Amino acid sequence: MQEKAVVLDDQMXRRALTRISHEIVERNKGVDNCVLVGIKTRGIFIAQRLAERIGQIEGKEIEVGELDITLYRDDLTLQSKNKEPLVKGSDIPVDITKKKVILVDDVLYTGRTVRAAMDALMDLGRPSQIQLAVLVDRGHRELPIRADYVGKNIPTSSEERIEVDLQETDQQDRVSIYDK
């Protein structure tokens, strides 16, 4: 894979997450009935960063959960020997029933990950509302899904790939476009 361009550096990403945090607070008139749920793996770290910023804005904490969608995907990642899905587990510290759940992921592409996440959430409770926050929306939807909060829209071709690097997993913050 050949890197074509860095489309978000660390400063641009910080600004995008700060803007998303303000939008979440504004749209929900605070965060009293809200829960951030990050989709494993990078969505969790983005959700934690949003929670930190929302805490600074509102002066109160917002609950953060982790969602593993492995069993809900239609393109399961399988272990090579016994052909069973790799499951890491979800951890949502609060009952999501009647809560506004803000799903958080790094990249929105076909919509299949988000559909799987909604299926997983519904098995855990009955939220009053599900919203979606993503760092990058690259288009190419296969399902009728759109993000409520977007850090940056990055139109891509189907021959390109978006790579999100985060400090927590990759020792740097940036978003790049690569040729496949």
From Swiss-Prot:
CDD domains: PRTases_typeI (cd06223). The keyword Transcription applies. It catalyses: UMP + diphosphate = 5-phospho-alpha-D-ribose 1-diphosphate + uracil. A motif (PRPP-binding) lies at residues 101-113. GO terms for biological process: DNA-templated transcription termination. Keywords: Glycosyltransferase, RNA-binding, Transcription, Transcription regulation, Transcription termination, Transferase. Its EC number is 2.4.2.9. It is an enzyme of class 2 (transferase). GO terms for molecular function: RNA binding; uracil phosphoribosyltransferase activity. Belongs to the purine/pyrimidine phosphoribosyltransferase family. PyrR subfamily. Regulates transcriptional attenuation of the pyrimidine nucleotide (pyr) operon by binding in a uridine-dependent manner to specific sites on pyr mRNA. This disrupts an antiterminator hairpin in the RNA and favors formation of a downstream transcription terminator, leading to a reduced expression of downstream genes. Also displays a weak uracil phosphoribosyltransferase activity which is not physiologically significant. Homodimer and homohexamer; in equilibrium. This is Bifunctional protein PyrR. The gene is pyrR.
